Amino acid sequence: MHHFPDVVVTDRAVFFDGQELPWYIAEEGITFQVSNTGIHTLTVDFLVEDVAFKSQWEINHDGEWAWLKRTVALEMRVQQRAFDRIMKEFDVRG
């Protein structure tokens, strides 16, 4: 079941589902608008140095490489366990 995040706003931080947003919030940079439809709007203005947006191609490309990295790491763990099992089975040190 889908739910919207629970948000807590203090004078020093904003928390989404218990996780503090780790950025600098602009002074007077938090606004909240109540809606009659039940979907309320919270706006937080952050102080940033630079902003970059990824294209859909970059998002897909990064996702493919992330998947490949996880697959290789998993295969390495599987092979390492097999190697450890063989080394333990044929341990000649005594």
Curated annotation (Swiss-Prot):
Domain of life according to the entry? Viruses
Q: What is this protein called?
A: Gene 41 protein
- Native source species: Mycobacterium phage D29 (Mycobacteriophage D29)
